[in-house]
């Protein structure tokens, strides 16, 4: 069981809850999602409550995260898109903290569950659709008719644009889920090699050096991937929000 690279993604029911035949149990995934929100909120509170003129290192990290999201949203959707800043910033911090939490031993990576990443993606696309129709009415549908397209191929282009739009939550969720899943499986496999070889005596310990070095290298790479996936998720969210703010562009 310890060497099974898939076991780390198992969903365990901690508090069974059944409501009308619907399983609403509190699981390890639920617990670490709550932990993610608490840690992210606590970090932002502690780093934003300082009164000193010179920011601490943690304050600087918090400010960089703020500026990154604000700049990405402003560049993608303009000043009108800044009303979505709390939403996008919350998504960024949740994905980032969830990714980092999962890199520590015995901690769960909630973003390795497709149901979690797909729910986040549906939240993004649902917000885009709701705001698009709320703000522009049926003018939001201009999103599916790019300007300058010859009339004869408009039906084909509209069909392609609709399929592309509907595939966004799938691509957005699978990208995050697959990267976190693959990275953790690879890390677990190399760590398993280290444990297995070390149990073979002196010769095995010598042979475990290379897998150990690979494990350290992959761990460092996973921290980079954890940030990059939060970065990509946020940038794409900003681009999708631009479609809701400026559907005719």
Swiss-Prot record:
**Regions that span the bilayer:** 26-46, 84-104, 114-134, 143-163, 185-205, 208-228
Q: Name one GO cellular component term.
A: plasma membrane
Record-linked CDD domains? ATP-synt_Fo_a_6
Give the source's domain of life in one word: Bacteria
Q: Does the keyword Cell inner membrane apply?
A: yes
Q: Which GO terms describe its molecular function?
A: proton-transporting ATP synthase activity, rotational mechanism
**Main localization category:** membrane
Topology class, membrane: Multi-pass membrane protein
SUBUNIT field? F-type ATPases have 2 components, CF(1) - the catalytic core - and CF(0) - the membrane proton channel. CF(1) has five subunits: alpha(3), beta(3), gamma(1), delta(1), epsilon(1). CF(0) has three main subunits: a(1), b(2) and c(9-12). The alpha and beta chains form an alternating ring which encloses part of the gamma chain. CF(1) is attached to CF(0) by a central stalk formed by the gamma and epsilon chains, while a peripheral stalk is formed by the delta and b chains.
Name under which the protein is recorded: ATP synthase subunit a
């Amino acid at each position: 069981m310890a060497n099974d690279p898939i076991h780390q993604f198992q969903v365990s029911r901690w508090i069974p809850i059944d409501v009308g035949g619907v399983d609403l149990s509190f699981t390890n995934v639920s617990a670490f999602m709550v932990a993610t929100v608490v840690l992210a909120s606590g970090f932002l509170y502690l780093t934003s409550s300082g009164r000193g003129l010179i920011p601490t290192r943690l304050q600087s990290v918090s400010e960089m995260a703020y500026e990154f999201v604000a700049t990405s949203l402003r560049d993608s959707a303009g000043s009108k898109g800044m009303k979505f800043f709390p939403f996008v910033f919350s998504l960024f911090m949740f994905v980032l903290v969830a990714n980092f939490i999962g890199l520590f031993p015995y901690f769960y990576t909630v973003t390795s569950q497709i149901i979690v990443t797909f729910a986040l993606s549906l939240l993004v696309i649902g917000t885009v659709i709701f705001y698009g129709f709320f703000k522009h009415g049926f003018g939001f549908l201009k999103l599916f008719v790019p300007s300058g397209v010859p009339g004869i191929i408009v039906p084909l282009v509209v069909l392609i644009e609709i399929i592309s739009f509907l595939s966004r939550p799938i691509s957005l969720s699978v990208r995050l889920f697959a990267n976190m899943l693959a990275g953790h499986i690879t890390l677990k496999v190399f760590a398993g090699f280290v444990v297995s070889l070390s149990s073979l005596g002196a010769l095995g310990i010598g042979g475990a050096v290379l897998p150990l070095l690979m494990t350290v290298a992959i761990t460092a790479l996973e921290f980079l991937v954890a940030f990059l996936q939060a970065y990509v998720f946020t940038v794409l969210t900003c681009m999708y929000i631009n479609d809701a703010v400026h559907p005719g562009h």
